[in-house]
């Protein structure tokens, strides 16, 4: 199976831009709330809107360093609710849920593939490559505009593949023991490095990671 070729250069700013975008009502919500989230010092990961009355509006967000806690989620929720009430990207009642991306997180930025290189992921393409849309394997980062993965293809040895971001419809980490350990270790290090924080994570921090 051949790598899908694309040659682009990407700045560090572009590497943190989301390339996975919502559609429909979720896209309308994103256009309203993303500037608010960024003004609070966080970044949007993913939005999902489900149900009818009330609609469930699920928002995944995080700090630029990948962390977030329950207090952060409550702060963001309080800021977003009045914005949604005023701008009304949809009609009717809704319930707002703000959370972390979780350990088996969606991968929505080029930097996500770099940050979690070496861990397993599932990737779904918007159109088939060599007759298939779904791939699973070990992330090998992001290079020349492509997501790199050592893919398991059923028979034979895994193959090094690359997919341009324009083809990525969905990408998510696979929950493994190694991923859980790595995520918790990273969170502890970042938590202990913040001014005014102790070296230990509390139960809320761990719960946020596991959501």
Residue locations for each model-derived region?
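Short Lys/Arg-rich amphipathic alpha-helical segments
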Residues: 1-173, 177-211
């Amino acid at each position: 199976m051949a790598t899908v070729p694309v040659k682009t250069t990407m700045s560090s700013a572009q590497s943190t831009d989301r390339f996975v975008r919502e559609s429909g009502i979720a896209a309308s919500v994103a256009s309203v709330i993303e500037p608010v989230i960024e003004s609070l010092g966080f970044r949007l990961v993913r939005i999902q809107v489900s149900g009818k009355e009330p609609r469930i509006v699920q928002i995944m967000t995080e700090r630029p360093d990948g962390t977030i806690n329950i207090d952060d989620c409550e702060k963001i929720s309080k800021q977003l609710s009045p914005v949604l009430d005023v701008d009304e990207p949809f009609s009717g009642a809704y319930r707002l849920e703000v959370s972390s991306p979780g350990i088996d997180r969606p991968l929505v930025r080029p930097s996500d593939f770099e940050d979690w290189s070496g861990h397993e992921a599932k990737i779904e393409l918007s159109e088939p490559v060599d007759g298939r849309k779904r791939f699973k394997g070990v992330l090998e980062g992001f290079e020349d505009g492509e997501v790199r993965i050592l893919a398991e293809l059923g028979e034979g040895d895994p193959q090094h593949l690359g997919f341009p971001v324009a083809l990525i419809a969905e990408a998510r980490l696979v929950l493994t023991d190694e991923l859980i350990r790595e995520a918790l270790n990273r969170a502890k290090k970042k938590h202990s490095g913040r001014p005014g924080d102790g070296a230990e994570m509390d139960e809320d921090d761990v719960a946020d990671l596991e959501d």
